[in-house]
Every structure is written in C-alpha cells, then in structure tokens.
C-alpha cells in the first residue's frame, strides 16, 4: 500500500521538476526516484478521497511513445488517457492521473517503437495488443503474474483494503497434485492442506482457475498468512485447472456439469483420501470464482446447495447466456441477465452468497447490486461489496480472503 506521507518533501521536489519541465540533475532525479515509493502519490486539495498519482518510465532508447495500461482506467477504449509525456532532452516519460484513494489495480507499461501505427497503439488497451507490456521497475510492491510470463505491477492506494497476505513467502503445509476426470476430461487438481493440528476442523475452499491461483498468485502462502493472522478459520484449498483458455470458456459459466462433478464425485473422493483430517461440514465448504468462474460459483449455490454453504462470486460475467448470444461490450444496465433469472428461479435457501464487483466494471455493477437485492427479497443471505477497481486479480485476491473470513461468523 502506497503511503503518501512517506518523504513528502522529496516527492514534491520531483513533481515540481516534472511540472516545470526542467530537471536540475538527471542522475540525481533517478537516484531520488529509486529511493521512493513509485508511483508518486500526493493528496488532492479539497478532495480527501482522491489522490494524484505520478508514474515514471526511463527510456533507454528513442521511442515514439510510452503507454500506461492501468486496469479499467486507461485500458480498452481509454488508451489516449494512458499516453505518457516525454520531458525534452531527458530520458523521462511521465503521466499523472487523479484516482480514488481506495483504488487497487494492476498495470503495465508499453514502449511504443518509432513508426508504430495508430491502429497498433489503439489495440494496446485490449486483449489483442501486439506490444508487450512490462512491470514497473520502480514499483517496490510485489508484482502480479496472472498468466504466462507477463508480470504486472500493482497500484494499491492508501484507502484500499490491505493485501498483506499476498506479499509473497513460502507455504508450510502439504501440497498434493493429481490428475482427475472432471466434467469428462482429465484435469490437474491441487489440494493444499495447511500445517495445522489434525484435531482442528478443516474447511475447504474450491477454486476454479486453479492454475492461476496456484501457479501465478501464490494462494498457498496467502492462506497460511491469513490463518496465522486469524483473519480466517483453517481451510484447505482445492484448485481445479483449466486445460486451456478455449476449454475454460466451455466449462465455466452457467453450466451444471462441472458443479455436479465437483460436488458429487471430487469432494467426497478428496475427503476420503484424507481420513485423518477432521473435515468441517458444508457450512465451511466454499466455492469461489472470478469472472466466468464467478458464474460457476453462483451455479454451485443453484445446483449443489447441499454441498456448498458459502459461495464467493467476484466480478461475475452477468452477460453470459447458454446460447452465447451476448458479449460484455454489448451488455447494458437495462438488459435482462440470464444469470440472475436462472439463479432466482430456484432461490438457494441455506446458502450464503457473497457478491463482489469492481466499481469500474460498467454495467456489471448495477446487475450485481440488483441480484443482491433480489436474493435478499427471496430470503437468501446475500452480502455485496464494491471494491474500487476493475476486472482484476489485484483486488480479487483480497476479496478471496475477505470472503473466507465470513466463515468466522
């Protein structure tokens, strides 16, 4: 978390030089920048819930431009907002954005070589970008690596929820890996059992997108930290891998086969293979998912209420339909959500539902809020939280620990 009170005079000195367009000594400038928390964060006079955030990039060779891709702030159609400015006769590129003080999001920086077309630059804000982004070398916070080898930096401002459990480290429990037939295909499954006394009741958290949580985000160490900090009760974590991105879209979402296989076959098998453990009952059995996986979590409440006592749905893809006739960019606040209607056609009594969404996720926000209210009206225990951010593992990580914390009650 970036503390704007750290070295305020040094931050002011750098910002004043940038504003004046004159750097007294370039070597001293970069030495000072490397000693500070970058991006540089300063308060906004008269707006206590906002911050001015200054990003820096040091160019090692001539460039046409540098683009800051910040989740749901400068990405997608907002590429122009993320274009940095060069200070003449220096190697400095900079951009200052005014952001909510509670913002948490991932970002990367893209160098734009000379001769790059406007079309290529415009594509840089979306999934079809051809220019490779890099993490911010001046950002001292742990990087995030969601898929592949592309690392991103994380901006967590001072009023955002803390992410201390995700600061890296090693897990101390037992990690078991196996191949299982789930939903008709062989998949890698990871079971993490924390190092706790076998006499303690042990809950179970099931995570689709297991390869992301285990290979890229370090969920095992985070669970250990949260247990040790008494933020959550002891839980094991069961991750179910996708085979590839295409297959992920085939199996996650509103389909029932994955849910029924997990509830009817996988969980009984996993527990039977660990008979020495004191497995907690369904009240501490959790299904948690994000995006398409967020819909799968809701389907856990719909199709397996006897198995899951709590589901955590983060940024659910409320646009999803079985016919695949809808897309995120075409789904508006006034459209009917198949997801909501299907879930409410048989309200999952006895299942606690935690809905979370990023404040910058457009039409998803009102749809999630409406689903929350309708669930309550239907007699379902529903919780709803809005995190300041986008469609992003940066805050989904924290929401996972927050959601598991509901088991304390």
UniProtKB/Swiss-Prot annotation:
One of its GO terms (biological process) is iron ion transport. It is an enzyme of class 3 (hydrolase). Keywords: Cytoplasm, Hydrolase. It is found in: Cytoplasm. Its EC number is 3.1.1.109. One of its GO terms (molecular function) is iron ion binding. One of its GO terms (cellular component) is cytoplasm. This is Iron(III) salmochelin esterase. The gene is iroD.
């Amino acid at each position: 978390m970036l503390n704007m009170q750290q070295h305020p005079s040094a931050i002011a000195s750098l910002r004043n030089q940038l504003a004046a367009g004159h750097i007294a000594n370039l070597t001293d400038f970069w030495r000072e920048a490397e000693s500070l928390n970058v991006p540089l964060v300063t308060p906004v006079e008269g707006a206590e819930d906002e911050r001015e955030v200054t990003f820096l990039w040091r160019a090692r060779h001539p460039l046409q431009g540098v683009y800051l891709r910040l989740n749901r702030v400068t990405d997608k159609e907002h590429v122009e907002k993320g274009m940095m400015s060069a200070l003449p006769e220096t190697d400095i590129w900079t951009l200052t954005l005014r952001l909510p003080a509670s913002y948490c999001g991932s970002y990367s920086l893209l160098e734009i070589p000379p001769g790059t077309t406007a079309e290529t630059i415009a594509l840089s804000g979306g999934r079809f970008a051809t220019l490779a982004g890099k993490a911010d070398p001046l950002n001292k916070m742990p990087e995030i690596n969601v898929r592949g080898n592309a690392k991103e930096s994380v901006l967590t401002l001072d009023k955002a929820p803390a992410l201390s459990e995700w600061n890296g480290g090693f897990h101390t429990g037992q990690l078991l890996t196996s191949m299982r037939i789930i939903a008709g295909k062989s998949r890698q499954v990871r079971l993490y059992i924390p190092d706790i006394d076998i006499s303690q009741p042990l809950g179970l958290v099931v995570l689709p997108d297991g390869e992301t949580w285990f290979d890229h985000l370090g969920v095992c160490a985070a669970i250990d930290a949260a247990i040790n900090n008494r933020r959550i009760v002891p839980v094991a974590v069961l991750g179910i891998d996708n085979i590839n991105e295409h297959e992920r879209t085939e199996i996650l979402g509103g389909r029932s086969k994955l849910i029924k296989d997990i509830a009817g076959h996988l969980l009984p098998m996993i527990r039977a293979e660990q008979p020495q453990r004191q497995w907690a009952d369904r009240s501490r059995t959790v299904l948690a998912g994000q995006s398409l996986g967020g819909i799968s979590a809701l389907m856990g409440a719909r199709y397996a209420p006897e198995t899951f006592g709590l589901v955590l749905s983060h940024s659910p893809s409320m646009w999803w339909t079985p016919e695949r006739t809808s897309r995120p960019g075409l789904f508006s606040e006034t459209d009917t959500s198949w997801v909501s209607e299907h879930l409410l056609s048989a309200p999952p009594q006895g299942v606690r539902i935690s809905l979370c969404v990023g404040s910058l996720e457009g039409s998803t926000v009102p749809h999630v809020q409406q689903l929350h209210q309708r669930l309550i009206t239907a007699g379902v225990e529903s919780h709803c939280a809005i995190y300041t951010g986008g469609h992003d593992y940066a805050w989904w990580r924290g929401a996972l620990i927050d959601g598991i914390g509901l088991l304390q009650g």
